[in-house]
Amino acid sequence: MTPVLRLINRTGLVTQICIGLLAGIALALFAPAVARDLAFLGKVFVTALKAVAPVLVFILVMASIANHRHGQETHIRPILWLYLLGTFAAAVVAVAASMLFPSSLVLSTSEASLSAPGGIGEVLQNLLLSAVDNPINALLNANFIGILTWAIGLGVALRHASDTTRGVVEDLSNGVTLIVRVVIRFAPLGIFGLVSATLAQSGLDALLGYLHLLAVLIGCMLFVALVMNPLIVFWKIRRNPYPLVLMCLRESGITAFFTRSSAANIPVNLALSQKLGLHEDTYSVSIPLGATINMAGAAITITVLTLAAVHTLGIPVDLPTAVLLSVVAAICACGASGVAGGSLLLIPLACSLFGIPSEIAMQVVAVGFIIGVLQDSAETALNSSTDVLFTAAACQAMEQRSA
């Protein structure tokens, strides 16, 4: 083995990612033309993650359920409640921050030609339709609700299959997991390409006009990540939550920040869950499920941008309406489903609570896309790191009870 390969093997993945991050920033500042040419490194990495994630989830969930023995305990229900509690708590934090530090928008006159859902019923209907999607179509389009539905269905059916069949499914799961490990090893190069290209192409000039709005958004996400989530985890495990919280932010949040897709970060979260020694039958289901419904960052984005529009238009907001907005934002956030920028398209739905017409609401969406370089990255980092955090908290709480 060459000295370079030995050094790479000795250096931790997080350290390598940090080196790639700093190198990407330096290249974008000093040689932006070269940085733009290296954008393909980031594209290849994100594409590889997105390609492997649907197959990984399908095979892993199916294998987990097919090989599940009667009497083995899983902790999906408490994790599901943690996901819902965390998303609602994030929406409440966003409402409080927007009331304390109201933001004003300079709404653009250009109309965004985007298709946004018409109501909560439509969001729930879309989720139901996603669940009964054709399995091949679900895999092709990374429809994780449909993938989960078919994986669970096939897994339950294969529980009655022969040991040989279940062994083949388990071997497939191990094979796909090995491929994922190889892809994740290229994360430092991918992060290097993503950071250098993003800074070289967009720069930070476009964000300067929205500093207050960004401060409220990022502030809410940091508060949820460093205060609210640790409180929820402490309530579950009854000990210092910060070692676990910081590990999840460092090993899951950093990668998610740059891939900007909860779906693409599923392999990273599964690898971290394995590293933490969590219950495999639990995390193989809860992590892909979290990428679909655990959307604390999306709830914050929907709430803050909606209340910014409300404040700009001078519409009064009473407490019951604010509480209703928190509930609506939490429900709508579940429809964001790991799509980069997906939460922005749900803003018109929340704006409709205040009678804001679609034309103005879509201008707010346009503002969201302008600040999306930071907003979407921070949102995904919070969403994805919380998936593994709550899974770990629930698993550790159950282990303490059974000890």
Swiss-Prot record:
The chain crosses the membrane at residues 14-34, 45-65, 79-99, 138-158, 175-195, 214-234, 295-315, 327-347, 353-373. Keywords: Amino-acid transport, Cell inner membrane, Cell membrane, Membrane, Symport, Transmembrane, Transmembrane helix, Transport. It is a multi-pass membrane protein. It catalyses: L-serine(in) + Na(+)(in) = L-serine(out) + Na(+)(out); L-threonine(in) + Na(+)(in) = L-threonine(out) + Na(+)(out). InterPro entries: Na-dicarboxylate_symporter, Na:dicarbo_symporter_sf, Ser_Thr_transp_SstT. It is found in: Cell inner membrane. GO terms for molecular function: neutral L-amino acid:sodium symporter activity. Gene3D superfamilies: Sodium:dicarboxylate symporter. This is Serine/threonine transporter SstT. It comes from Pseudomonas entomophila (strain L48).
